[in-house]
Amino acid sequence: MQQLNRRSFLSASAKATAGLSMLPFLSKTSLWSENMFFNISLAQWSLNKSFRNGTLDPLDFAQIAKKEYGISAIEYVSQLFSDKADDAYIRELKKRADDHGVTSVLIMVDREGNLGTTDEKERAQAVENHHKWVEAAKELGCHSIRVNAAGQGTADEVKDAAIDGLGRLTEFADKHDINVIVENHGGYSSIGTWLVDVMEGVSHPRCGTLPDFGNFRVSQTETYDMYKGVEELMPYAKGVSAKSYNFDKKGNCKEVDFARMMQIVKDAGYTGYVGIEYEGNELGEKEGIIATKKLLEKVGSKMS
């Protein structure tokens, strides 16, 4: 009964947060505010190749999302600008997002140490390394940072370590009104039941999940059912990553049944942001983002 109450609380919190973050303006090409149960955001990772090779400037991300794709909410990726992310840079990111009327949703944080490492000193350092990103998220107006619950050892050993690491980071983030959310991102974290156990172990309203449609590869030889995994993680979700790859002639993703996935998302009572995260190799980054957006709008408009 306690678990059900907690899930109900998280669902209600997600709805309240989504309601507060609704924007007063719409893109001419987007139907989401009026006709869909969720909001569309753009994950910076969808353009990671262009940011990495210098074709695009991370400072222009908000402008690109709004003007190129008609999307008014963005999800940052720390590794694409971590080498220059001092206070002045973060302030400039915020200014540019504000100038273009774009909401900063979250920061996906990588390469700051493993929060699930069984080495206590390394885990403590990893927690501390994430502090600056909590502060950056607060400055940008994000509601969360996305972290990884990685570590070496048995499933139980890493679970216990992740509960400790996430718990300590969440206590810090709570003081800044920031959520700490974990993505299924390989290893044990791609096992839905394992990550649920971690969430229950942390048992903090600011610690949740970021279900990703595609990241359910546990190892080179083991995968977890993506639909089962998303369903298991949704009760704790404070965000959703709509991972897309390649598309058929009808505009559907070949690898992921978006209609089925979004029904799972809706059935969980989620009404927040669904982030476009394109990783295909048949379309370019721009075309892949547009295709994913069209698919989300097509599926979403039929469900609302």
What are these regions (language model features)?
Residues Q2-E139, E157-D160, D174, G192-T193, ...:
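N-terminal pre-domain/capping segments
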Residues A73-I74, I163, G167-Q263:
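Acidic/histidine-rich catalytic cores of soluble enzymes
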Residues V102, I178, A268-G272:
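A short helix->loop->beta-strand "cap" motif at the edges of active sites that frequently abuts
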Residues I107, I145-V147, I276:
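Short glycine/serine/threonine-enriched helix-capping/active-site loop
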Residues A137-D156, H176, I181-H185:
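Active-site groove signature of glycoside hydrolases
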Residues Q152-L166:
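Active-site cleft segment of glycoside hydrolase catalytic domains centered on the general acid/base Glu
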Residues A242, G272-E279:
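Conserved active-site loop/cleft motifs that coordinate metal ions or position small ligands
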